[in-house]
């Protein structure tokens, strides 16, 4: 089936003009995972014109290009619960999210079947088997620094941390203390060492009451950004690529707020190559910021709302130049050379499906429009 997507590349005309048809990314997965490292300094653009093209993005078989795919918010509540107990419940995502060399989502739930709800409107939880479902779908790591990771209080948090220790894929952004919460996980593919980190700056009761500190468990809080910046700088010293998956932005807004912009700017200066995230439940814009590629909001992904605009989503696939990523990089410049947005709609079953025809054209327009309020450039 044809996949409609926008591809942003360096060197041609404006990407805001036309949509494009593209075949799905494909190829064997080549990633391996190593254990997280603890955090404790190395900063490292200039825009040109760009184009929307119809040529396929480099897939997992291209040795000179590392592809990283990102999806938005995932939970397993309500009618999504059976998916968490079916190890193949999300396997249809392998042709999109799972087709890249490495992929990542935001796991917006406590991993527990116990505990007491904390005082808020919505509460999400899932059994540890949900991690097997995600792994089978081709997900290589999940971010859990968000406002639902501790929805079931201290008991739920203990279960979540136990699930993290036994997880088939790395979980970042939550831990038994601040060191663990801010620790990066290392993913390796095509000889490229990729650090992934996660933090939240959403001001609500999870961040206020359940931010990890020196002696207490919880999520990694980037309010203030001091500890996150230190973690990025440490990861920069020991990795070829540094990815930060943030929980940021304002509910139901399609443009980034000032705090999100300032945080992304600070992370780029600290050495992050890729900054992505969500929280707004809306697809936001994306583009290049100096040496980094930034996405201000990936939207919902596996979710219990199947009506627009909540159901608008997609997969962001970034192509990293392997030679440049693994070189010393004495001169500045981004290692992400190409970005592809594949628009999708969440179906009645809560699972996103690739948009086609008029829907694809319309959703590509929504994504391009969202990019116009970001201040980001459309090419490296």
For the regions a language model picked out, list residue spans one by one.
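Acidic, metal/ion-coordinating pockets
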Residues: 13-31, 35-39, 44, 49-380
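C-terminal motif of bacterial Sec signal peptides marking the signal peptidase cleavage site
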Residues: 9-11
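N-terminal export and membrane-targeting signals
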Residues: 1-4
């Amino acid at each position: 089936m044809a996949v409609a997507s926008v591809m942003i590349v360096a060197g041609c005309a404006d990407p805001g003009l036309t949509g494009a048809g593209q075949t799905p990314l494909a190829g064997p997965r080549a990633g391996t995972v190593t254990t997280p490292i603890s955090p404790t300094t190395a900063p490292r653009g200039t825009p040109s014109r760009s184009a929307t093209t119809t040529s396929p993005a480099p897939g997992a078989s291209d040795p000179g290009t590392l592809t990283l795919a990102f999806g938005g918010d995932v939970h397993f509540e309500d009618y999504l619960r059976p998916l968490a107990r079916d190890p193949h419940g999300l396997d249809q995502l392998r042709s999109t999210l799972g087709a890249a060399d490495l992929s990542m989502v935001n796991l917006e739930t406590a991993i527990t079947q116990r505990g007491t709800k904390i005082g808020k409107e919505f509460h999400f939880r899932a059994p540890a088997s949900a991690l097997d479902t995600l792994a089978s779908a081709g997900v290589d790591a999940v971010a859990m620094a968000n406002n639902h990771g501790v929805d079931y209080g201290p008991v739920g948090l203990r279960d979540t941390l136990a699930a993290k220790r036994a997880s088939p894929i790395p979980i970042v952004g939550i831990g038994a203390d601040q060191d663990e919460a801010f620790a990066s996980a290392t993913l390796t593919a095509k000889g490229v060492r990729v650090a992934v980190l996660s933090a939240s700056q959403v001001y609500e009761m999870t961040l206020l009451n359940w931010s990890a500190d020196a002696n207490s468990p919880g999520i990694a809080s980037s309010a203030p950004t001091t500890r996150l910046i230190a973690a990025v700088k440490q990861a920069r010293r020991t990795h070829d690529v540094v990815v930060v998956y943030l929980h940021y932005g304002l509910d139901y807004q399609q443009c980034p707020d000032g705090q999100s912009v300032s945080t992304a700017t600070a992370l780029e200066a600290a050495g992050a190559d890729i900054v992505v995230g969500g929280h707004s439940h809306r697809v936001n814009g994306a583009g290049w910021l100096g040496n980094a590629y930034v996405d201000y909001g990936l939207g919902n992904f596996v979710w219990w709302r199947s009506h627009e605009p909540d159901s608008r989503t997609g997969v962001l696939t970034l192509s990293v130049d392997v030679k440049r990523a693994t070189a010393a990089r004495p001169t500045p410049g981004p290692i992400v050379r190409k970005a592809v947005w594949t628009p999708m709609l969440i179906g009645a079953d809560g699972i996103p499906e690739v948009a086609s025809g008029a829907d694809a054209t319309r959703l590509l327009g929504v994504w391009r429009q969202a990019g116009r309020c970001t201040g980001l450039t459309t090419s490296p």
